Every structure is written in C-alpha cells, then in structure tokens.
UniProtKB/Swiss-Prot annotation:
The keyword GTP-binding does not apply. NADP(+) binds at G189, A190, G191, K192, M193, G194. This is Glutamyl-tRNA reductase. The lineage of its organism: Bacteria, Bacillati, Bacillota, Bacilli, Bacillales. Belongs to the glutamyl-tRNA reductase family. HAMAP family: Glu_tRNA_reductase.
Amino acid sequence: MHILVVSVNYRTAPVEFREKLTFQAAELEQAMNTLQNQKSVLENVIVSTCNRTEIYAVVDQLHTGRYYIKKFLADWFQLEIEEVAPYLSIFEQDGAIDHLFRVTCGLDSMVVGETQILGQIKDSFLEAQQVKATGTIFNELFKQVVTLAKRAHSETTIGESAMSVSYAAVELGKKIFGDLTDCHVLILGAGKMGELALQNLYGSGARKVTVMNRTLTKAEVMAEKYMGHAKPLSELQCALLEADILISSTGASEYVITKEMMTKVERMRSGRPLFMVDIAVPRDIDPAIDELEGSFLYDIDDLQGVVEANRAERLKEAEKIQFMIEEEMVLFKTWLSTLGVVPLISALRDKALAIQSDTMESLERKIPNLSDREKKVISKHTKSIINQLLKDPILVAKELAVEEGAGEKLALFAKIFDLEVEEAGNTEEVEHKRAWTPSVPSL
C-alpha cells in the first residue's frame, strides 16, 4: 500500500484556476464516496479551502492511483485531464506524509503558522471517517498529525506573529487608510472567513461595520458581537454607496458584485474611492471591476505581499516544528511497518488457541466428571500459560518487523512456528481490511 497526495494550491495555480477545482462543503461527502469507488483507491480524505484542494489517498499502486485521482478531479469538475495536470503537485510515501504534517501545522500556508488549516484538516478527516472513506492507515496518521499540530502551536511561538488571510486583508486596509475608526466597513458573508476579518477589523479600531449575508439572521448574530449592523443582501447596492472598505467571502458560485452593478454605484459615490478585498474562492467580485477608476480591488493572491512582512520571524519557529515533524514521521513509519506482522501474530494466536481448545476437549473426554466450574478454571489457566508462552515470540516478531530485511526474517519466524501466512512481513501486500481497524480516540 502507498500514501499519495494530489494537490492544487496557491503555489501551483492562480486563483482563477483554483476556483474551478473547489469542492463545496455540501458535496464533500458525495465526492469522497465517489473517489472511494475509484480503482486503486483504498482510503481517502479530501481537503478543499480557499488556498488549496488536496486529495490524500491510500492506494494499492502508485501509478494507477495517480491516474485515477487525476481522472476523478477532471471528471468531477468537468475538465480534461490535460487541463488539470499542469497545476497539480504530487507527493508520494514519505513526501506525502511530510506534506500532510506541514500543511496541518500551517507550514505550507500562505500565512506560515496560521491555525485555521488545522481545523479544516480535522473537519475533513472526521467527515471522511463518517462516510467510511478512511481505514487503518489514515485513522492512525491523521490522529498523529492533528495531535502534533496542536503541540507545535503550543510549544512554539509561531502563532504569535502568524496571520490569517483575513487578518492580512485587514492589514492591507490599514496601510491604505491608516486609522480605521472613521471608515465604514462592509462585510459580505457571515462564515468563518468573514467573522475572522470582522474580528481583526474590530481589534484595529473599526466601529462602523455592516454585515450582509443571504441569511439575515446569521448576519445579525455576527454583527451583534461587534456592535455592527446587519442588512439583507437585497440592499447590497445601497450598502456599497456608504462603504469605504469592503471585504467579501460569501462562498457563492457566481459573482455577487458585477462590473455593471459597480459602475452604477460609482456614479453615485461622487468620486469617493472604495477599497475592495475579495478573499472568497470562487471569487465574489468580478475582477473587471478593477478597471473602474474609483474601485481598488484585491483578491486572495494579492495578499501575498502583506503576508511576507512577518514571514522571516515565523520561519525560525517553522524550523523547530519541522524537526518535530521528522520525529513524528519516524514514529508513524515504525507503526506502519508493524502492520505486516499483524496477520502473523493473529495466526500464531489462532494456532495456540486451537491447541488449547483441542486439549480441553481431550481432557473432558478423559475426565468426564469435571464440573463446569472446574472446566472454567482449567480453561482459564491453560490460556494463561499460552499467553505467557506467546509474550516473548510476539515481542520478537514486532521487533523484526521494523528491522532491515523484515520480510525474510518474518518468513523464517513463520516457518519456525509452522504458520501459513501470505506475504508475512510485507506491509505493502497486507490485505487492507477495515474489519480490524482500531477505534480512534476523539480529536
């Protein structure tokens, strides 16, 4: 078995292409179910955010897995594979594991050290678990990844200077307007990104805030937290007349603000400039609006310059986290290598228990007057003898599984105990069964 990541992200693709490959939250369950039925795919988790769409998969063959995951992406978004392939990054085995750790810890984010991605990875994994798209390997890997990411943020200072994309948008506004106290701010979208932006705006002194959302009650709840006002989206054109700063993140599939709408608004603004930041993917604001004289539009890719300001300090802390990742990878790979010994240990236990069962039957025939209590006591003690005898061989088998040449050594182990196990010790050939998937503690 192999671990594979197929990624389109802000490093490999511009926002115009990323928005074509963005899964909506409501369709993730169906998408993971569909991917799970693809040839070669044994487990999968799909992560889709404004900066990345990534497929994490356990596959039986790397070449086949790569092809069918690319095909799945192309088919799902009604594109040709040739259109998608140039924008993809592919990570395999150690590279895939390292990538997942780095992404979850915020080391691969546009804003290094941000914590929002940790919640997004965790949510995607839990949803994949619910639809039974994960199994033995990802249940363990994602548990370790989320645990390490939490530890990385608590044991380093990377979060102290890190910014979210929402905060970067606010920083850009402060550079242009300076004091935000007298600026009228309009927030489109009452989701996480919108609230993060509003939280940072409020912390920077903004007090004239209007929140708009398709569902007015959500806008009202968010506006109330920060002493703002809520309006229905039907009043958008009027709200644009009053705003100095607009930050938009609605998650709509079409432009919420068109060039035609903004052209009409500009005529009534009497030359007042409007600073617009579109942090949605797909974009909320028609990019053609940037051609208008009084509108200054920035999208999510334009925020990179703001992000770089604090990058050097955060990268020092990132080096510490990378060391933590490397240590955790050793632990995971050690665990992974022991999967090959599971059938061997099961076969050894089964053989020993079969001998114990045969012995009990023989004993009952020879001593037919045994009471039920006596049978129970004898059975308990004979099983105890078996457990004591197996303890050391099982420990040795686990040690052999992580040594060089594990396959040959475990094959010899199986021969010594006369065990019939196919491909003993070969992790890549162990049958992938969820029947023996361990339960995963709550994250």
